[in-house]
Amino acid sequence: MLHIKTIEGQLDAKGLKFAIVATRFNDFIVDRLIGGACDYLQRHGCDRENLTIVRIPGAFEMPLVAKKLAHSGKYDGIIALGAVIRGATPHFDFVSNEASKGLAQACLESGVPLGFGLLTTDNIEQAIERAGSKAGNKGAEAAAAVLETVRVMEQL
């Protein structure tokens, strides 16, 4: 069988610096996501002093702040954490779509990996499930994704 070169990222955060952009809106959910992300990174070797949390009002502000952090050159990876919960108006669609597109654009323009932990749920129960109960912790999952991507990018 032919050997095919495979590039994979090791889940070792030692020596890396991360910024977490987290919304204040729905903070009782977002605080759990932050806890999951920080716990994951620290369990994988990231020193507490290499983590910076930037609190912002809401999801719409995330792309601008993530882009500024990514272009600062201070961080190996950015993690975006927030919770947008559907209401009775189309506001949910506008905010979640623009935040998602803006975060992807910030990542692509800067070349700095970004972990996407912006919950977009139909109700509060779904958000709670994704912030550390039945559906795991999406903050930890975003941290895992950005860590692995940072380590892959180092090899490319």
UniProtKB/Swiss-Prot annotation:
Gene Ontology terms, MF aspect: 6,7-dimethyl-8-ribityllumazine synthase activity
Pathway participation: Cofactor biosynthesis; riboflavin biosynthesis; riboflavin from 2-hydroxy-3-oxobutyl phosphate and 5-amino-6-(D-ribitylamino)uracil: step 1/2
Binding site for 5-amino-6-(D-ribitylamino)uracil: 25, 59-61, 83-85, 116
UniProt: (2S)-2-hydroxy-3-oxobutyl phosphate binding residues: 88-89, 130
Catalyzed reactions: (2S)-2-hydroxy-3-oxobutyl phosphate + 5-amino-6-(D-ribitylamino)uracil = 6,7-dimethyl-8-(1-D-ribityl)lumazine + phosphate + 2 H2O + H(+)
Assigned EC number: 2.5.1.78
Gene3D superfamilies given in the database record: Lumazine/riboflavin synthase
UniProt keyword list: Riboflavin biosynthesis, Transferase
GO biological process: riboflavin biosynthetic process
Domain of life: Bacteria
Gene Ontology CC entries for this record: cytosol; riboflavin synthase complex
Active-site annotation: 91 (proton donor)
Function text: Catalyzes the formation of 6,7-dimethyl-8-ribityllumazine by condensation of 5-amino-6-(D-ribitylamino)uracil with 3,4-dihydroxy-2-butanone 4-phosphate. This is the penultimate step in the biosynthesis of riboflavin.
Similarity comment text for this entry: Belongs to the DMRL synthase family.
Record-given protein name: 6,7-dimethyl-8-ribityllumazine synthase
